[in-house]
Amino acid sequence: MSVFTETPTNAVEPFPFLCYNKIKRSGGFSMIRNICKDEFFLSRKAEPATADDLSVAQDLLDTLAAHKDGCVGMAANMIGVNKRIIAFDNIGEYMVMFNPVLVKKSAPYDAEEGCLSLTGTRKTKRYQTIKVQWQNEQFQTRIKTFTGWTAQIIQHEIDHCEGILI
């Protein structure tokens, strides 16, 4: 997700697991991928992620970090991989979610968002508070409530996993 024109306030505390202060990669190689702009590919629902997809998550983090000046979140399909993996800036630290699902949402509002995969900005409905279930890098299930800006980023990236283009 690229820079938004509306930024709700955020009262989320930093996350203790699956956050990255800096990009980690065994072997020291960075894999920055090209951004996919193929709307047909982006509109496909993503396949569930597995432990075999850990390297995809790292590539996603590397690519997100390379675009940090104009991007706060990415889904795997944005780098050409049709898997349910998202990465985003969670209050200054990168976080990855495997197989994220919105389980609860409240307080709808209208937002205008941009995306590195699409031209321009588009209006969409978002929710101020969301509860998300996902798996961490050990594929343990986690559930957490997010609010504000972070919630908006997560919703945008989960939309990518569902094949929904803003």
Residue ranges, per PLM feature:
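Positively charged
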Residues: 20-166
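N-terminal amphipathic/basic-hydrophobic helices that include classical n-h-c signal peptides
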Residues: 1-30
